[in-house]
């Protein structure tokens, strides 16, 4: 028996997001694509006008499920040109099964996208996995960024990475058993999930995904590491947003005394599942952009 009403809410949310993503894939929102420099097809959506803002979703997500369902695409598109990406291994984009096709390569996709759209610079907003990719992009191509927003993530360093969890997650995905280890790691509250909860939510997370591609994404995560030396010389204005109850908060805290041009905003009471849908998340991002352009 499932012990928590929260379980039903989490599962219902995942099912709804899967349906939302499926509707987008069937053409209810306009999509475009280009071929990245290594030959992988990348799909993206563009809405609005103004300074460009690239949105990078989390693992198992899509542009629609992370950003569309939360209303962030629509709200930002009122003031900015929003470019929401289905990252490789996800959604409508290509899904190679080689870990070498991920990691740093996922950050370079953003550079390729900007080149494809003939944009010299853009704001980049990433959440969870997308946040770690944004950190890598800050290190790799700072001249292409107007600013960076790192949500639900922080410093992707070897010391803070949970290699055991990533290994277990990759093995689970390779066996076709879903994202259970990630469910256990991100589960909010002190009471752990039941095996039934882990199984149900772990399978719902990957219902519309290629599990072998996701496993390759996970095995490529180590290539997102960023050195302290690069963080100390950073010149890209960087906003880090994380929930006070997010298990990845130590990654965010570690940036405070290390990263130049960095500020941390904590959403009190929010966890990894609720931060993105909090009105405070979007309000904080919007205020950051307006401050940078002095256009309030």
Model regions and ranges:
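Conserved HGGG/HGGXW glycine-rich cap/lid loop of the alpha/beta-hydrolase fold
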Residues: 40-92
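Active-site loop/oxyanion-hole signature of alpha/beta-hydrolase fold enzymes
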Residues: 74, 84-122
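Gly/Ala-rich beta-loop-alpha elbow adjacent to hydrolase catalytic centers
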Residues: 126, 130, 134
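Flexible "cap/lid" loop of the alpha/beta hydrolase fold
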Residues: 135-139, 147-176
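Conserved alpha/beta-hydrolase catalytic His-Asp/Glu region
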Residues: 159-164, 177-230
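Short beta-strand/loop motif that positions the catalytic acidic residue
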Residues: 234, 240-242
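Conserved alpha/beta-hydrolase "acid-adjacent" motif
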Residues: 247-252
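Catalytic active-site module of serine/aspartate enzymes centered on a nucleophile-bearing elbow/loop
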Residues: 265-296
């Amino acid at each position: 028996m499932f012990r928590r009403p929260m379980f039903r809410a989490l599962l219902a949310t995942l099912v709804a997001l899967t349906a939302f993503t499926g509707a987008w894939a069937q053409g209810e929102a306009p999509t475009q694509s280009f071929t990245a420099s290594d030959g992988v097809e990348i799909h993206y959506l563009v809405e609005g006008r103004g300074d460009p803002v690239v949105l990078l979703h989390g693992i198992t997500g899509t542009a629609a499920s992370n950003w569309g369902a939360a209303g962030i695409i629509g709200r930002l598109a009122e003031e900015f040109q929003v470019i929401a990406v289905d990252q490789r291994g996800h959604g409508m984009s290509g899904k190679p099964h080689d870990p070498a096709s991920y990691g740093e390569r996922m950050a370079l996709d953003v550079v390729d996208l900007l080149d494809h759209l003939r944009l010299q610079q853009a704001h980049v907003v990433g959440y969870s996995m997308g946040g770690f990719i944004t950190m890598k992009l800050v290190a790799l191509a700072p001249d292409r960024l107007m600013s960076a927003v790192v949500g639900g993530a922080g410093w992707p360093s070897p010391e803070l990475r949970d290699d055991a969890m990533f290994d277990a997650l990759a093995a689970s995905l390779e066996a076709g058993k879903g994202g259970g280890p990630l469910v256990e790691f991100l589960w909010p509250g002190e009471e752990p999930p039941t095996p039934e909860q882990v199984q149900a939510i772990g399978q719902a997370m990957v219902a519309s995904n290629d599990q072998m591609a996701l496993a390759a994404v996970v095995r490529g995560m180590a290539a997102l590491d960023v050195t302290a030396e690069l963080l100390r010389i950073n010149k890209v204005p960087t906003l880090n947003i994380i929930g006070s109850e997010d298990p990845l908060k130590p990654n965010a805290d570690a940036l405070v005394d290390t990263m130049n041009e960095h500020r941390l905003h904590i959403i009190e009471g929010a966890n990894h599942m609720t931060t993105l849908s909090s009105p405070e998340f979007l309000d904080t991002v919007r205020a950051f952009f307006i401050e940078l352009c002095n256009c309030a």
